[in-house]
Amino acid sequence: MNPSTAQAEVLVDELVRNGVRQVVLAPGSRNAPLSFALHDAAEAGRLDLHVRIDERSAGFLALGIATRTRRPVVVVCTSGTAATNLHPAVSEACHAGIPLIVLTADRPPELRAAGANQTIDQYRLYGTEVRLFDELAVAENRPGQNAYWRTQVCRAASMAAGTTWGGPVHLNLPFREPLVPSGDRDWCEPLDGRADGQRWTEVSGNESAPSTLSKVRSRRGLVLVADGGADSASAWGERYGWPVLSETGGVGLSGAAAISTGMWLLKLPGFMRDHRPEQVLCVGRNTVFRQVQSLLADSEVEVLLAHGGSHWPTPAHNVREVAETFGASPGPADPDWLTGWQQADQKASAALHAALDLERWPNGPVVARDVVDALPAGSLLVLGSSNPTRDVALAANHRPDVVVHRNRGVAGIDGTVSAAIGSALAHGGPSYALLGDLTFLHDSNGLMLGPQEQRPDLTIVVLNDDGGGIFSLLEQGSPEHRGSFERVFGTPHGTDIGSLCAAHGVEHTVVRQRSEFGVALRRRPGLRVVEVRADRAELRGVHERLHAAVRGALHG
């Protein structure tokens, strides 16, 4: 057996022993030893193999799967720029705490700095954005290699899963030719793993008791939920009388403490003067809304963070305590505190939805509400990082039976189609995505599925306003910048999304009437795109009218 084949087979076997069941492969020549080993393992039913020809898409597909399963997913590529194209997914996984195991093939040392083809410096390619980097030595037919290879896989898998907060790890693998199996199975030592399929090295600590917050003691507190932990946060808030707000509004929250219009209420200075919390307990990375950042930067508010690991977010540098879970009771709650938030939520919600009913269809908030209302129970909803996540938070009805996925680690729009497909494959139930046109087009390669690849049951709703609608709501969209806005912020593209879908063999529907929308969203098998065309010129006015309606309901 040639050394590269032996190494690849051992690495794949030990990955399976460490619980890896999902692998995404981008094809190439230098990673051929891994490709053969992965194909054999998939044929034997030991793992599910997904093949993608675009490495960026492959990385985000793996990220989507890992986000839903919370188990390490492996992504494999060849050398050169193939490896650099995984960097956006690695960045997202780093800041969101998603367990990825990145295996990059490389040239052996004698071909580096020598002008060899498809060769770059891959040593620590992803810098500080991986929990572990290791470059394995070039494989040799000598005793001790089996134990070395298996030990390093266990080390990487343990770091990806994380004792407190998992994330991406990177193994760089220099393969020397020959790169294809020779048919000869002779080796200088047995290449078997431990008996009964056990890991080569068991790492204690991944299942130890999580740390808990000890300084939760306010009678007037808020819980702010980003991604993950919505169920436990909802239960904790209801038990102790703390209102629970989310960056996805009422979608994913449950219980009597859930405040579906929380992002609107935080935006009302008059309301917040009377309802300023003493403590805010943040769950995850709350990064979308400026009103949230203003609250967290308030020197009169103590901020606690339920978030494992060292990469906890604190832009205002004022977090009082960080732990993995909420901890014990904060003590007796102010009996009027939660009631005040609940009553405000009821008033704001009634005014908001009455105002939405008056808006002309389609626009972002109205479409977001319609999508959420149409979701079957138990659905997955993937949200694009620009307007869709904001539209759902500001306009959707309360849906505790829906699971939300967002790429909010670094909040880029790249890879969202691929991440949605990965999340849908792992979810196994009805799955939907709500994306803007730029987010969709940025990762349209994600629609490229080979005939032997798994196809998700996923409906992608694209709100197409021909450009960057998010900027209409920011300072750049104010009237004094009208002369430059369209060229450098609006960025119209004129792309025919239907033709693009047809090129990939993906079903596409354009919905022009609201009465058609519910029918188009009915659950059906397979991958499809539902396009809704909107005018972003009206978006700023829509948000101003909704804000005025909520403000009027609470302040007259």
UniProtKB/Swiss-Prot annotation:
Gene Ontology BP annotations: menaquinone biosynthetic process
Pfam families attached to this UniProt entry: TPP_enzyme_C (PF02775), TPP_enzyme_N (PF02776)
Keywords: Magnesium, Manganese, Menaquinone biosynthesis, Metal-binding, Thiamine pyrophosphate, Transferase
Cofactor section: Mg(2+); Mn(2+); thiamine diphosphate
Note on cofactor: Binds 1 thiamine pyrophosphate per subunit.
Pathway: Quinol/quinone metabolism; 1,4-dihydroxy-2-naphthoate biosynthesis; 1,4-dihydroxy-2-naphthoate from chorismate: step 2/7; Quinol/quinone metabolism; menaquinone biosynthesis
EC number(s) reported in the record: 2.2.1.9
Transmembrane segments: none
GO molecular function annotation: 2-succinyl-5-enolpyruvyl-6-hydroxy-3-cyclohexene-1-carboxylic-acid synthase activity; magnesium ion binding; manganese ion binding; thiamine pyrophosphate binding
Disulfide bonds: none
Catalyses which reaction(s): isochorismate + 2-oxoglutarate + H(+) = 5-enolpyruvoyl-6-hydroxy-2-succinyl-cyclohex-3-ene-1-carboxylate + CO2
Record's keyword annotation contains Methyltransferase: no
Subunit structure and binding partners: Homodimer.
Chain's role: Catalyzes the thiamine diphosphate-dependent decarboxylation of 2-oxoglutarate and the subsequent addition of the resulting succinic semialdehyde-thiamine pyrophosphate anion to isochorismate to yield 2-succinyl-5-enolpyruvyl-6-hydroxy-3-cyclohexene-1-carboxylate (SEPHCHC).
PANTHER family: 2-SUCCINYL-5-ENOLPYRUVYL-6-HYDROXY-3-CYCLOHEXENE-1-CARBOXYLATE SYNTHASE, PROTEIN PHYLLO, CHLOROPLASTIC
Family that this chain belongs to: Belongs to the TPP enzyme family. MenD subfamily.
Protein name, as recorded: 2-succinyl-5-enolpyruvyl-6-hydroxy-3-cyclohexene-1-carboxylate synthase
Upper taxonomic lineage: Bacteria, Bacillati, Actinomycetota, Actinomycetes, Pseudonocardiales
